[in-house]
């Protein structure tokens, strides 16, 4: 794998706010694959679980599709984009209804191999 080539994995429509996910992503950006998994495993945030799955998936993609060593992988890019919002209604007094927006996000992880 040359320095320009990268391996990517995306988790789409994850049912958590992109703002909450970005707080966790900032802690693992630029770290090695193994270090990122260790950090994610012990974080007290709900966003850690779906991010852990995507990081694990991108390493599996690198090993199976490009025959790379997982120990040499470094997270070069990681970001969360906003997905569609699920719209729900909360009944209120006197026949009114309030709108509830339940956010989703798309988590993208790109890794590169260091030599």
Swiss-Prot record:
The lineage of its organism: Eukaryota, Sar, Stramenopiles, Ochrophyta, Bacillariophyta. Its main location: plastid. This is Large ribosomal subunit protein uL22c. Keywords: Chloroplast, Plastid, Ribonucleoprotein, Ribosomal protein, RNA-binding, rRNA-binding. GO terms for biological process: translation. It comes from the Eukaryota. This protein binds specifically to 23S rRNA. It comes from Thalassiosira pseudonana (Marine diatom). Signal peptide: none annotated. It is found in: Plastid, Chloroplast. The keyword Acetylation does not apply. HAMAP family: Ribosomal_uL22_B. Disulfide bonds: none annotated. PANTHER family: CHLOROPLAST 50S RIBOSOMAL PROTEIN L22-RELATED, LARGE RIBOSOMAL SUBUNIT PROTEIN UL22M.
